[in-house]
Regions:
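Terminal amphipathic alpha-helical/low-complexity segments used for targeting or macromolecular assembly
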Residues: 1-53, 59, 66, 192-198, ...
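Secondary-structure boundary/capping motif
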Residues: 4-6, 82-84, 178, 185
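Short low-complexity stretches enriched in small and charged residues
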Residues: 22, 92-97, 154-158
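Acidic, glycine-rich loop-and-beta core segments that form the ion-binding/anion-interacting portion
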Residues: 50-110
């Protein structure tokens, strides 16, 4: 004004559009506005978000209809979630993860660069990194895929219908065959290949025998 320049006003649809970001507090306030809009979009598309105030989903995530997201869940970028899934509470999905229809990722779980097949259950206290998990697999509480050997990230393959017992540690690379079973607390060494319908137990894991053809051990 003092230099003779004109001053113009800009009208915005709402006050939030004109928020300035000059401090860390301003940044947090603006991020909360954006997060709310992202969640509103998902809910309008048929996703149930139980508590939007305690749910964090990045903008480029894709989630199918009738999936339920429970509180204290963090879903980061580049993630695909199918229809009729259940995620959380207290779950963290990291980039590169794909979850097929009707799968479940429960409380205190972390999934990174992992694919979960249809109707697979990962319900309690587990970490899956760089895993390729088939359909109708049950992952027990406390299971870990130890994907990093200090130099490389390695992949764990778990085939359809497998049953991974609680507290199993799979030191990648590992292959678990179709409808195979790992015993609770088993430590499966790097490079192990468990045959279809095989049973592995112990520390280190040893293959006991193969099962007769059977249905999946869980409904």
């Amino acid at each position: 004004v003092e230099r003779g320049h004109l001053v113009a006003t800009v009208e915005t649809p709402n006050a939030q559009e004109g928020l300035g970001i000059n401090t860390r507090e301003d940044l947090a306030v603006s991020a909360a506005v954006v997060r709310q809009r992202i969640l509103q979009r998902f809910m309008a598309d048929g996703v149930t978000i139980v508590d939007p105030a305690a749910t964090y989903i990045d903008a480029d995530v894709k989630i199918g209809q009738d999936t339920t997201i429970h509180p204290f869940t963090v879903i980061e970028n580049n993630i695909r979630i199918g229809k009729n899934c259940v995620i959380g509470p207290f779950a963290r999905l990291r980039p590169g993860t794909k979850i097929a229809n009707e799968a479940q990722v429960g409380n205190f779980t972390e999934v990174s660069r992992t694919h979960l097949g249809k109707k697979t259950l990962l319900k309690h206290f587990a970490f899956l990194g760089d895993a390729r998990v088939g359909a109708k697999v049950n992952i027990g509480a406390g299971v870990v895929t130890a994907n990093y050997d200090g130099k490389n990230k390695n992949v764990t393959h778990i085939a359809d219908g497998a049953f991974v017992g609680s507290d199993s540690i799979l030191i990648a690379p590992v292959k678990v065959g179709k409808k195979a079973i790992t015993g609770a607390g088993c430590v499966i060494k790097q490079g192990t290949v468990i045959p279809a319908q095989g049973i592995i137990v112990g520390v280190p894991g040893r293959i006991l025998r193969k099962l007769r053809p059977r249905a999946s051990p869980w409904p």
